[in-house]
Amino acid sequence: MTDQTTRLPVRRALISVSDKTGILEFARELSALGVEILSTGGTYKLLKDNGVAAVEVADYTGFPEMMDGRVKTLHPKIHGGILGRRALDGAVMDEHGIKPIDLVAVNLYPFEATVAKPDCDLADAIENIDIGGPTMVRSAAKNHKDVAIVVNTGDYAGIVESLKAGGLTYAQRFDLALKAFEHTAAYDGMIANYLGTIDLAADTLSTEGRGAFPRTFNSQFIKAQEMRYGENPHQSAAFYVEAKKGEASVSTAIQLQGKELSFNNVADTDAALECVKSFVKPACVIVKHANPCGVAVVPEDEGGIRKAYDLAYATDTESAFGGIIAFNRELDGETAKAIVERQFVEVIIAPKISAAAREVVAAKANVRLLECGEWSAERAAGWDFKRVNGGLLVQSRDIGMIKAEDLKIVTQRAPSEQEIHDLIFAWKVAKFVKSNAIVYAKNRQTVGVGAGQMSRVNSARIAAIKAEHAGLQVQGAVMASDAFFPFRDGIDNAAKAGITAVIQPGGSMRDAEVIAAADEAGIAMVFTGMRHFRH
């Protein structure tokens, strides 16, 4: 078994980086420790200009850089020095004048940043495919028994500390090698994804339609947490997050207190947070089993999130028990106190948690309190995935939103201004309810939610039952449906319940029949032209 604690010193290092963050300080520390530094191109110039002694690779190999820098380090004196097994290949290395290279610090051409530029063409992308860098990275990672490979700028300080203590252990070199292979895997994946979307006939990158999906799909996720179990206790589980952090989300959130997040906690918290992010004014969303069971929006001058929580909770006090609560404003002490005194809650998440709120929630040690940071009003584009047996469904994120001016009034009666506000509110909520989804809302508060039924009319019936059970007034409320009504019965039931306005996508072959039902009941109805199935 390999000794994991014995430290190996570094006598010679090769440094060639595109991201020069911290490289001067790192090189100075290496030089101060007596390490001979080999370097290339822009990195060599940076070191030389700043007084750090280094040998240019071209001088070391006796072979110049050529082909506009395409060939720099692809030489036996470099790769022999990296790949040479110290216990086996010493004689061969001596015979050919190859000196051992004990540490390689390399990061790669910025391919991702290059192809993200609007004016990037295929030729630009090709020139930013690194060849020498990944070759050195893989060589050093393969020979991690004798060589340390450094691809992350964040590792520099720790490496210097270890070298000052006598060298790097095998365990450290193994970990660095793993990071290196993760790095090159992600890099090659980006290249394959990009080239897989190229339309050769147009010699350009396709950005719409089928051409937006690469021939193979490569994406990298990093394990953030191993969980006690999965959706059910007999299932094992872990939580992986995207390598590149995006907008504020459950994946970027910091847990301030509470028990470890479970598989279901993460899924439900994501549903709650993404729903509350849909609203600009202060809002509260309560989720149970990935469905919103209570949502409310209240302007600051009318009570803000404190009042919004009361209204969201009132929608369905039974389902709120053991739920997830999300806010789109800083959680204050008063609101936190109302929550912990009123109900059992699994998770509370907000962009910011006040000191007063932290103090209040600390009395309930098991409550998971998450701070996710602020987000912009614009939802970021990206991909959603759904695993099926033997495959993966990939689609663009459902970030479609509608405004009042997008609504198509299809009935004789137009909705009032208040009804329009409530219709848009209910529509935003329905987007996050499992299909078939029906949402009853009034004064920007949900009064009944019907979720996950195979029949749309049954979802409408459940929404009415929920409202009655909660003691909430349906008369004068509006109704949102995530998809069109295939028959008029959904409207007939809504009319009996007291619904006065309806928002739905439209598009049924029986739209005329459905519109007629609304007109007969004096209901105002608008079409969005956008469906929000959620499975």
Swiss-Prot record:
Pathway: Purine metabolism; IMP biosynthesis via de novo pathway; 5-formamido-1-(5-phospho-D-ribosyl)imidazole-4-carboxamide from 5-amino-1-(5-phospho-D-ribosyl)imidazole-4-carboxamide (10-formyl THF route): step 1/1; Purine metabolism; IMP biosynthesis via de novo pathway; IMP from 5-formamido-1-(5-phospho-D-ribosyl)imidazole-4-carboxamide: step 1/1. It holds the Pfam family AICARFT_IMPCHas. The keyword Oxidoreductase does not apply. InterPro entries: AICAR_Tfase_dup_dom_sf, Cytidine_deaminase-like, MGS-like_dom, MGS-like_dom_sf, PurH-like. SUPFAM superfamilies: Cytidine deaminase-like, Methylglyoxal synthase-like. It comes from the Bacteria. One of its GO terms (biological process) is 'de novo' IMP biosynthetic process. GO terms for cellular component: cytosol. Keywords: Hydrolase, Multifunctional enzyme, Purine biosynthesis, Transferase. GO terms for molecular function: IMP cyclohydrolase activity; phosphoribosylaminoimidazolecarboxamide formyltransferase activity. It catalyses: (6R)-10-formyltetrahydrofolate + 5-amino-1-(5-phospho-beta-D-ribosyl)imidazole-4-carboxamide = 5-formamido-1-(5-phospho-D-ribosyl)imidazole-4-carboxamide + (6S)-5,6,7,8-tetrahydrofolate; IMP + H2O = 5-formamido-1-(5-phospho-D-ribosyl)imidazole-4-carboxamide. Residues 6-151 form the MGS-like domain. Its EC number is 2.1.2.3, 3.5.4.10. Belongs to the PurH family. The IMP cyclohydrolase activity resides in the N-terminal region. This is Bifunctional purine biosynthesis protein PurH. The gene is purH.
